[in-house]
Amino acid sequence: MRSIIIATIVFIAVSLAGCQTAPTKKTDSPAVVTKMGVSEISPIEARPAVEAAYSQFVDVRTPEEYASGHAYRAINIPLDTLAANLDKLEKNEPVYLICQSGKRSMKAAEILDQAGFSQSISIAGGTTAWRAGGLPMAERK
């Protein structure tokens, strides 16, 4: 009977040892996730970074979309002109990108990555999610 109990304890201990998780790599921004090689962050988690004294926050929507209301502090560089306006951005500083839903900002992040920018981050859900989160907007007057 004693050998059965010992065997059971050993079996449980070995089974539990196999369930350990691998240590996770600590990052500066654990909220940033990567989709197809492009970093993405939620609007709530992006807010402190884009409200910093110096931040690069780019709205890649059309000028008409931008004029109808945009995330506070975002500058407008439409996606179709981004490649021609790379000189307006600092390559060695993070660039936060936003559009309407998150698709164009993901494309913009890919353009910046290919151009050698150190960190380009798409705002998940775009302006729609930004507004829904109650975050500051610059509305048309």
Listing of model-derived features with the role each one plays in the protein:
Residues 2-8, 14-55, 64-94, 103-141:
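Rhodanese-like catalytic fold shared by cysteine-dependent sulfurtransferases
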Residues 98:
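Short, surface-exposed ligand- or partner-binding patches at beta-edge/loop junctions that are enriched
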